[in-house]
Amino acid sequence: MGDKKSPTRPKRQPKPSSDEGYWDCSVCTFRNSAEAFKCMMCDVRKGTSTRKPRPVSQLVAQQVTQQFVPPTQSKKEKKDKVEKEKSEKETTSKKNSHKKTRPRLKNVDRSSAQHLEVTVGDLTVIITDFKEKTKSPPASSAASADQHSQSGSSSDNTERGMSRSSSPRGEASSLNGESH
């Protein structure tokens, strides 16, 4: 009674394949070498099944209800955030409304103000021109400073532009000084 074999059930035979040195990943179908324990593309272990588990109906119902609830709350939260930001902006603008501060340049000598009035049609604009602060004035910048104080005509603007570009720091400093 020791030899019980079922004649109807054949033995499992390995697949006849020409590529014995490789295995195909069950997830990404990448062909890996036989020595590889994990897939070289997706790091899935060799022999991992791709069968998806059946969803539990209670869990699915719970997840579905959670998906629909957060959007309504997030809209309220967004609305509250927007209102809060608006109120903060209003309070900051109210605080700053009583004193208007103009942006100030740090590299400007305020004592060297020169005012120039330009009128076009019925509009008059006053341009206040300041000299740059220099830590140690070289001979070339001192000469350009003399040109500033001597000239007072409307062609003064072109001379100023040229004298600024000949400053020791070059054109970059004059651009930075004027753009702010």
Swiss-Prot record:
Pfam families, A to Z: YAF2_RYBP, Zn_ribbon_RanBP
A single GO BP: negative regulation of DNA-templated transcription
Positions with biased composition (Low complexity): 62-73, 136-156, 163-174
Modified residues (Phosphoserine): S167
Subcellular location: Nucleus
UniProt keyword annotation of Zinc-finger present: yes
The organism's place on the tree of life at top rank: Eukaryota
Disulfide bonds: none
PROSITE patterns membership: ZF_RANBP2_1 (PS01358), ZF_RANBP2_2 (PS50199)
SMART domains: ZnF_RBZ
Family matches, as InterPro entries: RYBP/YAF2, YAF2_RYBP, Znf_RanBP2, Znf_RanBP2_sf
Any one GO MF annotation of this record: transcription coactivator activity
Biased composition range(s): Basic residues: 95-105
Cellular component terms per the entry's GO annotation: cytosol; nucleoplasm; nucleus
Keywords from the UniProt entry: Metal-binding, Nucleus, Phosphoprotein, Transcription, Transcription regulation, Zinc, Zinc-finger
ZnF RanBP2-type: positions: 19-48
Location of region: Disordered: 1-24, 47-120, 132-180
Biased composition annotated in UniProt, kind: Basic and acidic residues: 74-93
Cited function: Binds to MYC and inhibits MYC-mediated transactivation. Also binds to MYCN and enhances MYCN-dependent transcriptional activation. Increases calpain 2-mediated proteolysis of YY1 in vitro. Component of the E2F6.com-1 complex, a repressive complex that methylates 'Lys-9' of histone H3, suggesting that it is involved in chromatin-remodeling.
Subunit structure: Interacts with MYC, MYCN, RNF2/RING1B and YY1. Part of the E2F6.com-1 complex in G0 phase composed of E2F6, MGA, MAX, TFDP1, CBX3, BAT8, EUHMTASE1, RING1, RNF2, MBLR, L3MBTL2 and YAF2.
The protein's name in its UniProt record: YY1-associated factor 2
